[in-house]
Amino acid sequence: MRDGWGGGRLSCVIALLGTVAAGCGEPGPTPEDAKAFVERAEEQLLELWIDAGRAAWVQNTYITDDTNILAAEAQATVIGATMALAAEAAQFDAVDLPEDLRRSLLMLKTSLGVAAPSDPTLQAELAVISTGMESTYGRGEYCPDNAEACLSLPQMERLFAESRNTDELLDIWAGWRMVSPPMRGQYARFVELANAGASDLGFADLGEMWRAGYDMSPDEFVAELERLWGQVRPLYEALHCHVRAELAEEYGSAVVLPGQPIPAHLLGNMWSQTWANVYDIVGPARADPGYDLTRLLESNRVDELEMVRYGERFFDSLGFAPLPETFWDRSLFLEPGDRDVVCHASAWDLDYESDVRIKMCIGRNGEDFVTIHHELGHNYYQRAYRGQSPLHRTSANDGFHEGIGDTIALSITPEYLVEVGLLETAPPADRDLGLLLRVA
């Protein structure tokens, strides 16, 4: 009986000890812990984003080996901190969180445009490669045979918009693209490192990471994109067919092959983004928009800075506050003659509060007039979300910023040009077809 009693007591004691041990273990993370983590991460990242943004601005507007190094170091710091925080955030994967908090953790993971592996050495390598390629692009120029001087990208863009000599256009198109072959090895390594970084964050590759930022699964995003493209595809196939036929009539079937893709160098835009600059060739006979915006700017003696003022007044008319003086003091509006810069137009938010700027080498033409309104659309959107928490001081998704900019650009209608005094009278409604084709 003693043995039986003692064995029973011992079993109870062991069971009790096991219960106590389980009860005294470390508690798992809670939603409150996740909220505190996000707030701490935002505070840390905001400071790093500001530092990296300033370094990137200097590097974009004053390209030297030294500014490349400074920008790469700042970018590597952001990458390292973000990857470390993303790894720390994994502790909340199994926690039942409110949807907004769960989304904040996903935004933390995807806040890097390009992820990098967890290894600090590889993070630094990726930052150097990224900055170096951007610098190469910004410094890019083409030196035609027997030319007195090399051509910068803005100079090539002007020639591309105005020339109708197919040999010259093809020469410029191919010449500009000689800037990229030296980056081939760098780019391949860039993709390798970025895919490895995305994998460390739990994604299959960088593409899946990018597709994860639209409040749906990456596969759902692909399906939605295909659905939307299916809606507009018939229209764009018809438009491209028309443009190809008009270009073939202008240049001949030996240059524009029937049934083949439109030759990229014939569209008047270095990246084949629009056909507005060749509208005189591709526009229907009775669909003249009734005005040429470039000529309107010239006849009204509107210089490059005044073009930006027109953009600001557009937003003034909608009730927005004027741009701060720092915008005018710190933006880059003209291509400088004493240094290399990245001329490609972009909008910047340097301190996530009020230090907004644009960077572009403005030409006095209609295309850049529209681009200015587009870029300012980004700036005013940036000002609109500055009261949000740091992770939410960004576009609702990667496409929304461009949607804002393009919506503003589409507002540059004949009626608007009349209102601001650039055009005397708006063309009749039957000219709308030409206007729509130009912006399609």
For each feature predicted by the language model, list its residue ranges.
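Hydrophobic alpha-helical scaffolding
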Residues: 119, 180-184, 222, 229, ...
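Secondary-structure transition/capping motifs at alpha-helix termini
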Residues: 316-325, 351-353, 365, 379-391, ...
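Post-HExxH zinc-binding segment in Zn-dependent metallohydrolases
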Residues: 225-235, 395-437
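C-terminal motif of bacterial Sec signal peptides marking the signal peptidase cleavage site
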Residues: 20-23
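Active-site recognition of the HExxH zinc-binding catalytic motif
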Residues: 367-383, 402-406
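Active-site-proximal, well-structured secondary-structure segments within enzyme catalytic domains
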Residues: 148-155, 189-359, 428-439
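N-terminal helix-rich structural modules
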Residues: 26-189, 207
